[in-house]
Amino acid sequence: MGNPPSAHKDDSGAKWLFAKVGFAQGVKLLARILCSAVIGIDAYIVEVEVDIASGLPAYTTVGLPETAVKESRERVKSAIQNSGYRFPDDRITVNLAPAHIKKDGTGFDLPIAVGLLAATHSLDHNELGRYLILGELSLDGRVKPVAGSLPMALAARQAGYDSIIVPHANAREAAVVDGICVYPAETLSQVLEHFAEGPALKAVETDRETLFRNRPPSLSNFSDVVGQEHAKRALE
């Protein structure tokens, strides 16, 4: 694995931490990556904390993960290995904060993978601190679309972040939000190169006026709803 980079904490307030701490049997590594999750129609910021410690190989996810999040372990491991990187053979703990809110969906795959590799590779932590990262991973390392990229982009802007990395298929939706740079990613390797070797992702721009002007008209109304007469009358 080589010698990890020296300990460094970004004093600019970026929500990212890279640290090396003396450990009884070796080295302990910690990385923190920001992503987002959706509850209903609203999104909130989630901190993905990845801790890699010496010990028997193990992988634990905490922070009220639902089934799809627990299953991310196998997707992340295969995506990392099939992208040409080494998956750590150590004791890994992934914490999704805030821990009191249930986490669901597959959008945590990409930030978890970036966190694992940020703790063991030389990535630009100053840049990492500027981004929210979200996306599902296929076993070969491709970044697949997720639900809720629009409210996630809104949450990023409201939290003061100016950049977000999303799956390529979600880029136009997220780019509707003004005041934030949206970077579409097609593979895990592209994201890692973006932080290790310099900008590898290009921000996408959306012509909002054209997008809304060309949207198909909505022809549905309450007459299409069978029953629920009292509810329809109340809404009217």
Region spans (language model):
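Peripheral, non-AAA+ core regions of ATP-driven protein-machinery
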Residues: 2-7, 11-236
